[in-house]
C-alpha cells in the first residue's frame, strides 16, 4: 500500500510539472512581478518539505545578509522556484542544504552524492537527468521550470560545482 501511495504521489507531481511547463511554454501563465519579500515564500517552502528534510537529516542552513531582503519577482513563481530547488536537493543531494541571499541574489547549495557529476551545460534542459538521477525518479522538468520562471521574471539562473557541492544561483532583475 505504501508503494502505491508513493507512486501515486510521484505521478501527481509529474502531471503537475508537465501542466505547469506546458502553460509556461504556451504563455498561458501571466506573472505579475514586483518587489517581493524573499524570505516568507522560502519559509513556506521549507515548512512544506519539513518532513522530508528531517528524514534526510538535511536541516537547512539559512544565510541572509538581512531579514527584509526583497527581490523583483512574482510571489507565486518565487515560491515555485524555491519548492523545485528544495525538491531537487532532496532527490539528488547528499544532505546539507544551504540557502544564502544578498541584494538581488539567492543561492541554494547542497552536497553531491558520490558518483558522476551532473552535466552543468544541460542541468536546466527540459527532461535532463544525469545517469544516477534516473534511478531516483522525477521527470527532469523541475530545474527547467526554475529557469523558465526566472527568465519570465527578468532574472537568470546558473549552476556550478565547488568541491563536493552543487550550487544554483538565482539572480533577480533590479
Q: How would you describe each model-predicted region?
A:
Residues 6-11:
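Short alpha-helical segment of the dimerization/phosphotransfer core of two-component systems
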Residues 26-31, 70-73:
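Conserved micro-motifs of the catalytic ATP-binding
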Residues 96-105:
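Short beta-strand/loop element within the Bergerat-fold HATPase_c
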Residues 115-128:
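Short conserved segment of the HATPase_c
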Amino acid at each position: 500500500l505504501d508503494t502505491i501511495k508513493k507512486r501515486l504521489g510521484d505521478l501527481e507531481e509529474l502531471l503537475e510539472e508537465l501542466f505547469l511547463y506546458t502553460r509556461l511554454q504556451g504563455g498561458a501563465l501571466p506573472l505579475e512581478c514586483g518587489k517581493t519579500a524573499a524570505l516568507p515564500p522560502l519559509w513556506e517552502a521549507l515548512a512544506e518539505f519539513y518532513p522530508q528534510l528531517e528524514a534526510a537529516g538535511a536541516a537547512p542552513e539559512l544565510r541572509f545578509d538581512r531579514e527584509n531582503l526583497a527581490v523583483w519577482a512574482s510571489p507565486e513563481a518565487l515560491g515555485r522556484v524555491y519548492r523545485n530547488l528544495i525538491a531537487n536537493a532532496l532527490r539528488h543531494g547528499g544532505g546539507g542544504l544551504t540557502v544564502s541571499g544578498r541584494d538581488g541574489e539567492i543561492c541554494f547549495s547542497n552536497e553531491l552524492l558520490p558518483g558522476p557529476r551532473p552535466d552543468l551545460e544541460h542541468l536546466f534542459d527540459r527532461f535532463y537527468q544525469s545517469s544516477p538521477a534516473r534511478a531516483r525518479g522525477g521527470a527532469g522538468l523541475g530545474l527547467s521550470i526554475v529557469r523558465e520562471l526566472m527568465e519570465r521574471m527578468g532574472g537568470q539562473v546558473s549552476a556550478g560545482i565547488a568541491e563536493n557541492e552543487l550550487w544554483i544561483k538565482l539572480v533577480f532583475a533590479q
